[in-house]
Amino acid sequence: EAICGVSPVLMRPPGGYIDTRSLSVVGNMGMSAIMWSIDTRDWQHRNAQRTIDTVLSQVRDGDIILMHDIYSTSADAAVVLIPELTARGYQLVTVSELAAYRGGAAPGHKYSQFR
């Protein structure tokens, strides 16, 4: 909050690991835990085409896609995926925008998609 000027309301647990106790703490802090419905495993294979294929074969409305911006292959995949998903009728939004559109995210709850 001191750095960005607002209190965070969403958090992604490192590695996607969160237990009941941690989720309770997150909720007491007014936050929801955000997971993902499509894991591209881009960190493991570092292959742009494989990332593209994974997303395009699995994507559905309301999905949260996990990709890591620290790999050039993930950035290369995004350059292809963004126009392709848009052409298929998807609107790319932030998780906050997606949650708000689908009724919001309750503190102390875990979400991997919003449908």
What residues fall within each predicted segment?
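Catalytic domains of cell-wall/extracellular-matrix polysaccharide-remodeling enzymes
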Residues: E1-S112
